[in-house]
């Protein structure tokens, strides 16, 4: 559906119209439009369409919305622009196109931020994800003095060098929508673009959940259970990687259990974030948990390179 054909779906009027416009723009650039990954992740980068697909030589262009959870960022629904659950729009372009910045500026123009009418600036801000063992050269994009998105040239993911380098674009959808709609409180965002009794706001959709999950994240999440869940996820990740690894009798077969194993890595990461929000992990323990998750991510990344999607074949695996 073309959002521009429906006035109430224009990005300046509706949150969902903003998403549809970005979908339309990046589909026109040749991206596969994917759905959100169905697990609790801290950022769109955790989606295997980015983390795993950025590895290996095969070209890959995709875009998707990803609900993201950062338990420590909850403010019981009382902060106008800080949330423990929010939405990112993620674009991964591999290999990195030479006109990435031009494509990005085109996406801003598509949602109504004409670079000729707004002060668009790129501020150097290299990106790093310790739990994913990932980093890249990056820039924040500021529009009229407010950060609206970031783009990064991946150098490493899962502790593995990216060859070729991928270009990643990340839009904070709530912040971008607040700017486009001209509102100061995220809960006042018009979600569906309608008015009067038909209007649905962001707060009507998400405020109660934000309040309840803040209580859960800071006060009620069962820490004994979470510690067990972390151990279980870590153990299962390694067990699945072992189960899917080629055997000598397989005649150099490819790895067969990467995605289920990576799901367990994602689970371990989210459980760690909940434990961190509950304040039950010391400073020294925190670093240890980060390293444990990173080790899982690295093992998954290495296994992915021994799959067809990762660029391997039976001939290269031999």
Curated annotation (Swiss-Prot):
It is an enzyme of class 6 (ligase). Its main location: cytoplasm. GO terms for biological process: glycyl-tRNA aminoacylation. InterPro entries: aa-tRNA-synth_II/BPL/LPL, Gly-tRNA-synth_heterodimer, Gly-tRNA_ligase_asu. Its EC number is 6.1.1.14. It comes from the Bacteria. One of its GO terms (cellular component) is cytosol. It is found in: Cytoplasm. Keywords: Aminoacyl-tRNA synthetase, ATP-binding, Cytoplasm, Ligase, Nucleotide-binding, Protein biosynthesis. GO terms for molecular function: ATP binding; glycine-tRNA ligase activity. The keyword ATP-binding applies. Gene3D superfamilies: Bira Bifunctional Protein, Domain 2, Class II aaRS and biotin synthetases, domain 2. It catalyses: tRNA(Gly) + glycine + ATP = glycyl-tRNA(Gly) + AMP + diphosphate. Belongs to the class-II aminoacyl-tRNA synthetase family. NCBIfam families: glyQ (TIGR00388), PRK09348.1 (NF006827). Tetramer of two alpha and two beta subunits. This is Glycine--tRNA ligase alpha subunit. It comes from Chelativorans sp. (strain BNC1).
């Amino acid at each position: 559906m073309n959002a521009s054909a429906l006035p109430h779906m224009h990005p300046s009027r509706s949150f969902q119209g903003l998403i549809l416009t970005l979908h339309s723009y990046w589909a026109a650039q040749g991206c596969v439009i994917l759905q959100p990954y169905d697990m609790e992740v801290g950022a769109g980068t955790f989606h295997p369409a980015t983390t795993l697909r950025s590895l290996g030589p095969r070209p890959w262009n995709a875009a998707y919305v990803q609900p993201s959870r950062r338990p420590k960022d909850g403010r019981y629904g009382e902060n106008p622009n800080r949330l423990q659950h929010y939405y990112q729009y993620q674009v991964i372009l591999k290999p990195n196109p030479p006109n990435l910045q031009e494509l990005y500026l085109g996406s801003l123009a598509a949602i109504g931020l004409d670079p000729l009418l707004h002060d668009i600036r790129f501020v150097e801000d290299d990106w790093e994800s310790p739990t994913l063992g990932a980093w890249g050269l990056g820039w924040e994009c500021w529009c009229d003095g407010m950060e609206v998105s970031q783009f990064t040239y991946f150098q490493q993911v899962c502790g593995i060098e990216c060859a070729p380098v991928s270009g990643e674009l990340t839009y904070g959808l709530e912040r971008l929508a607040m700017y486009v709609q001209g509102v100061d409180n995220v809960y006042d965002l018009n979600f569906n673009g309608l008015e009067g009794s038909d209007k649905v706001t962001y707060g009507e959709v998400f405020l109660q959940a934000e309040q309840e999950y803040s209580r859960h994240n800071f006060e009620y999440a069962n820490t004994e259970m979470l510690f067990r869940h972390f151990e279980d996820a870590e153990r299962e990740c390694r067990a699945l990687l072992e189960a899917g690894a080629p055997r000598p009798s397989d005649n150099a077969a490819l790895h067969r259990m990467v995605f289920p194993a990576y799901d367990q890595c994602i689970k371990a990461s989210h459980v760690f974030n909940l434990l961190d929000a509950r304040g039950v992990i010391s400073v020294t323990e925190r670093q240890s948990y980060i390293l444990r998750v990173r080790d899982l991510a690295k093992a998954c990344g290495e296994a992915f390179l021994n799959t067809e999607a990762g660029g391997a074949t039976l001939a290269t695996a031999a």
